[in-house]
Curated annotation (Swiss-Prot):
Homotetramer. It comes from Salmonella paratyphi B (strain ATCC BAA-1250 / SPB7). HAMAP family: GMP_reduct_type1. Catalyzes the irreversible NADPH-dependent deamination of GMP to IMP. It functions in the conversion of nucleobase, nucleoside and nucleotide derivatives of G to A nucleotides, and in maintaining the intracellular balance of A and G nucleotides. InterPro entries: Aldolase_TIM, GMP_reductase, GMPR, IMP_DH/GMP_Rdtase_CS, IMP_DH_GMPRt. This is GMP reductase. The lineage of its organism: Bacteria, Pseudomonadati, Pseudomonadota, Gammaproteobacteria, Enterobacterales.
Amino acid sequence: MRIEEDLKLGFKDVLIRPKRSTLKSRSDVELERQFTFKHSGQTWSGVPIIAANMDTVGTFEMAQALAGFDILTAVHKHYTVEEWAAFINTASADVLKHVMVSTGTSDADFEKTVQILALDPALNFVCIDVANGYSEHFVQFVAKAREAWPTKTICAGNVVTGEMCEELILSGADIVKVGIGPGSVCTTRVKTGVGYPQLSAVIECADAAHGLGGMIVSDGGCTMPGDVAKAFGGGADFVMLGGMLAGHEESGGSVVEENGEKFMLFYGMSSESAMNRHVGGVAKYRAAEGKTVKLPLRGPVGNTARDILGGLRSACTYVGASRLKELTKRTTFIRVQEQENRIFNSL
């Protein structure tokens, strides 16, 4: 047993210090980035935000809507090959450019992903997702995926420490997914006592990944556009959003009605709701590590996407970053004990 004395921080613990700026307008800020990935050699340009691979977020409908904003969608792994084929037949090449194919690490997952990727060469992203990216089996699966798909861009996670980021990048991952427990419907931290404050995880993992020519995506912990800006400021190359994109027309959750008001169900992918839906219930040897919430219907996701991108542009103007790429270089975090004036929050 050992105790690390260093203070670890989440998004709520900091604000970004404003700096002099020569920008005249938020419209002067360029949010699009261009990346060439370490292993695949592929080049991609777009806004580096990803809709999470949850079945109440990462839907085909979400991918269609967010592609119009140049945003990626990690489509959840529970669609069948036939459903993928139907989607590809109606989707444009521009939409497919903004799609990640998600998979688990079982043999069945691998075989299904092989079939999906064979449907269209425009599917260039694979998202290998497990709750705990620290297992030897997971590292071996990433290496297997790299061997099978040498020209596909592979995103793999989740982990929260630099040495594991390095391990995954050396095993074939182009992008490492960072985050254990920060999600809005994740209960891993309270069920297991395991986790890592998200901002510190991003800063440390970005440092490790960039040293090897890899990249990271900050997955979880964002509750507002300012948190997205903080994740990019901390060094994240991409930011993945779940709860912020849930509850919309494109989100895919079941709609329930209470007292004349309609709500959409949103749940974590390790929740009892998810396991009942996809694997026939919670196995006797495990506990559910997610919760189910009812969200008021939020309308089309486009309005939320515009709000997030507008907040991100504004953050860049406050620190003088004319491009999103410059935000991390111009970010100075200050530790705080309050984020906002809450006097009217209950109204």
